[in-house]
Curated annotation (Swiss-Prot):
Residues 85-100 are intravirion. InterPro entries: GN_domain, HSV_GN. It is found in: Virion membrane; Host membrane; Host Golgi apparatus, Host trans-Golgi network. Coiled coil: none annotated. Envelope glycoprotein necessary for proper maturation of gM and modulation of its membrane fusion activity. Also plays a critical role in virion morphogenesis. This is Envelope glycoprotein N. The lineage of its organism: Viruses, Duplodnaviria, Heunggongvirae, Peploviricota, Herviviricetes. Keywords: Disulfide bond, Host Golgi apparatus, Host membrane, Membrane, Signal, Transmembrane, Transmembrane helix, Viral envelope protein, Virion. It is a single-pass type I membrane protein. One of its GO terms (cellular component) is viral envelope. It comes from the Viruses. Residues 1-27 form the signal peptide. The keyword Transmembrane helix applies. It comes from Equine herpesvirus 1 (strain Ab4p).
Length: 100
C-alpha cells in the first residue's frame, strides 16, 4: 500500500512538471511585449473629451442641482416612510400590551 507521503510527493512532482511545461510553452515573447504596449496605450488614452458627450449630461449647474435635489427628496421620503413605520410598530406594540 502506498503511503500518503509518497502520494503527496507524486502529486507535487506532477504539478511541478505541468507548471514547467506550461511556462515553457509561453509562446513568442514578442506577442507579450506587443500586448503590454497596447495596454499601456489604452491606459494613456483612457479618457477623451469626445467621450463626455455620451449619456446624461450633468455638467451644467442647473441640471446637476435638479438631479441632486430630486435624489435628496427621494432619500428624505424613504427615511420618513421608515420612521413612520417604526413609530407605528412601536405604538401598535404598546397598544397590544395594554389590551392584555
Amino acid at each position: 500500500m502506498l503511503s500518503t507521503r509518497f502520494v503527496t510527493l507524486a502529486i507535487l512532482a506532477c504539478l511541478l512538471v505541468v507548471l514547467g511545461l506550461a511556462r515553457g510553452a509561453g509562446g513568442d515573447p514578442g506577442v507579450k511585449q506587443r500586448i503590454d504596449v497596447a495596454r499601456e496605450e489604452e491606459r494613456r488614452d483612457f479618457w477623451h473629451a469626445a467621450c463626455s458627450g455620451h449619456g446624461f449630461p450633468i455638467t451644467t449647474p442647473s441640471t446637476a442641482a435638479i438631479l441632486f435635489y430630486v435624489s435628496l427628496l427621494a432619500v428624505g421620503v424613504a427615511v420618513a416612510c421608515q420612521a413612520y413605520r417604526a413609530v407605528l410598530r412601536i405604538v401598535t406594540l404598546e397598544m397590544l400590551q395594554h389590551l392584555h
